[in-house]
């Protein structure tokens, strides 16, 4: 899929011309954009050389800007700042993907598993509904320890 530039006309199936504001980017577009930015040969000279260490300060900065937008009840700015934090998450995931460790899909899967596991009243079977938060956390800790000891 080609990524369109802002202001660039988009042609839908059947050759119908659409204004760019009528079409929204998707999460998959964001993944492709990050891959293109990080490409070592043809990517962005700045984005392609960033590391976890070099990006740490930006993650802190962007999280601070999210908090500021919340404090100011500035929903328009909050939307933009959450996008900046999402970019930070995505670039860290892209770095890990390049190293063969994990992808954004692994991160999404992990948080979904955690939320389902921590809310047995909503997602669990009848037997699981009586688990306390403390019991769930204890089981998670045991599972992490078991994975580390493999």
Residue spans of the language-model regions?
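Flexible "arm" and connector segments at domain edges
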Residues: 18-81, 87-150
């Amino acid at each position: 899929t080609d990524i369109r530039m802002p202001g660039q006309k988009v042609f839908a199936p059947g050759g119908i011309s659409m204004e760019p504001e009528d079409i929204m980017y998707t999460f998959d577009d964001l993944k492709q954009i990050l891959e293109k930015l990080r490409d070592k040969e043809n990517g962005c000279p700045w984005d392609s050389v960033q590391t976890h260490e070099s990006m740490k300060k930006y993650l802190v900065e962007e999280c601070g800007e999210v908090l500021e937008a919340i404090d100011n009840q500035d929903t328009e700015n909050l939307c933009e700042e959450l996008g900046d934090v999402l970019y930070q998450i995505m670039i860290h995931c892209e770095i890990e993907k390049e190293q063969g460790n994990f992808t954004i899909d692994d991160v999404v899967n992990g948080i979904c598993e955690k939320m389902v596991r921590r809310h047995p009243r909503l997602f669990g079977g009848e037997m699981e509904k009586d688990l306390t938060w403390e019991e769930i956390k204890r089981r998670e800790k045991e599972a992490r320890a078991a994975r580390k000891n493999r």
